[in-house]
Amino acid sequence: MSRFLNVLRSWLVMVSIIAMGNTLQSFRDHTFLYEKLYTGKPNLVNGLQARTFGIWTLLSSVIRCLCAIDIHNKTLYHITLWTFLLALGHFLSELFVYGTAAPTIGVLAPLMVASFSILGMLVGLRYLEVEPVSRQKKRN
């Protein structure tokens, strides 16, 4: 396996663990969301919205962790890429369309993580394409 894919796998595990922490925080205390993320319109944040956000974050976390375990599963790889694209779209729309988020570190951090992850996963696609060919050559 290429060094890049190993780094990408480590990155996915790290992001997954952080997301697990965010999930727990969303279930434990919904003020986390309006104090850190949705600071533009905190009155729209309630317990139900926080738990929904927590489940969405948990699902993304599980998908990313599974991709790190089985990085050569192309379907799982593409689904994982979509988790980052959806997160990027969500936070950008909350920031620029709905005005529920302000450009604070609480929003900029997930935007940067999603952006770097998308970039890394797009680069990783090239390594996934090359690797199966090299495996077949070794067998022959």
UniProtKB/Swiss-Prot annotation:
Membrane disposition: Multi-pass membrane protein
Tissue distribution of the protein: Ubiquitous; strongly expressed in testis and some cancer cell lines.
Disulfide bonds: none
GO molecular function: identical protein binding; protein-macromolecule adaptor activity
InterPro entries linked: Erg28
Residue ranges of the TM segments: 4-24, 52-72, 79-99, 105-125
Superkingdom: Eukaryota
Family statement: Belongs to the ERG28 family.
Protein name per its UniProtKB record: Ergosterol biosynthetic protein 28 homolog
Organism expressing this protein natively: Homo sapiens
Gene: ERG28
